[in-house]
Amino acid sequence: MDTGEFKQLIDEKGHEFYRAMPWREDTRPYYVLVSELMLQQTQVGRVIPKFEAFIARFPDEETLAGAPLSDVLRLWSGLGYNRRAKFLHETAKMIITEYNGVFPSKKDGLLKLPGVGVNTAGAIMNYAYNQPALFIETNIRTVYFHHFFENGGKVADTDILPLLEQTIDKEHPREFYWAIMDYGTWLKKQGVGQIQQSRHYKKQSALKGSVREVRGQIIRSLTNADKTENELRSELLADERFSVALSGLLKDGLIMNTKGLFHLTK
């Protein structure tokens, strides 16, 4: 397929497979940031109700920055990867204190925000500001694998970037990326454009039996009440993963130990 045909196809598929999402209805930068951090490692169906609850409680950067981290973690609980909540909280504080409440719109400024890497910065530039910025993630890889790398073999993002540069709709980058994402999601459901082709592919580790599972259990337990280590161990039927999970949460600043009582960071 040549790039001209591909661009027309993406426009068609964008209309055919469009998915309504609250952060698409309102593309203010704060909403896009919240959605992008939530969508890291978490499926859209699980994110939408959490996003709506989060925005209802923390409607803007100022409200989020002024809230204790413990409130943010309580609302985040269930999404997993709780460090994302801490990054979001720190970002809100940074926007208020260092950016005078003005959300950065350029890549350099966005990359200074906690938890924002190249892909998240690119997503914010496209979705919030409608500025064409190249970024690649799983659904995007899926589409380009299917149409330009059908012969198999490992493909690096550096192989995809020139094609993305040639095919991105520079006048309507927001709609282009929405279309790519929605089409890629549909392709994956059909079992085509497999991400295993990517040189960057890493299979996500299973939650069951992992330290990550215990971290989530500790956070959920502490959303209800402060507890001693013995109380946590007894409640969670602690095994060898417990100590690693507990020390990791302390190191990440998600929980604290005050006079023998563990609690969510205020």
Report the location of each language-model feature.
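Accessory DNA-binding and partner-docking regions appended to nucleic-acid-acting proteins
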Residues: 210-215, 264-266
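A short, conserved structural fragment
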Residues: 250-262
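Catalytic cores of DNA base-excision repair glycosylases
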Residues: 2-213, 226-240
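Hydrophobic residues on short alpha-helical segments
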Residues: 215-222
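Residues in the recognition helix of alpha-helical DNA-binding motifs
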Residues: 124, 245-248, 264-265
